[in-house]
């Protein structure tokens, strides 16, 4: 994803509203509950929980191929 301000706004709104997002990463589709966006050594990282397993995931934004907010 070439992250635009609109993409950041949608992601931040999903975090604030405790919404769900669908993420494509390395050919895998994941449905996540985003919790936090942070910077780690200059790299933006999404902290989220997997919807099915509840597993906490840390995904660098650079690794996300596509994302959509799920309503």
Residue ranges of model-derived segments:
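A short, Trp-centered hydrophobic/proline-enriched beta-strand micro-motif
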Residues: 17-25
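Mixed-charge, Lys/Arg-rich low-complexity intrinsically disordered regions
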Residues: 1-14
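Short acidic/polar mixed-charge low-complexity motifs
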Residues: 28-29, 53-55
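SH3/SH3-like beta-barrel fold
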Residues: 23, 46-50
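Short beta-strand-centered aromatic/proline hotspots
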Residues: 30-38
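Structured surface patches comprising rigid loops and adjacent beta-strands/short helices at the edges
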Residues: 58-71
């Amino acid at each position: 994803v070439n992250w635009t301000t609109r993409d950041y706004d949608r992601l931040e709104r999903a975090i604030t509203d405790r919404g769900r997002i669908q993420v494509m990463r390395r050919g895998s589709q994941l449905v996540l509950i985003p919790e936090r966006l942070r910077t780690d050594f200059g790299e933006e990282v999404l902290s989220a929980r997997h919807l099915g397993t509840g597993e906490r995931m840390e995904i660098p934004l650079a690794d996300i191929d596509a994302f959509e907010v799920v309503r």
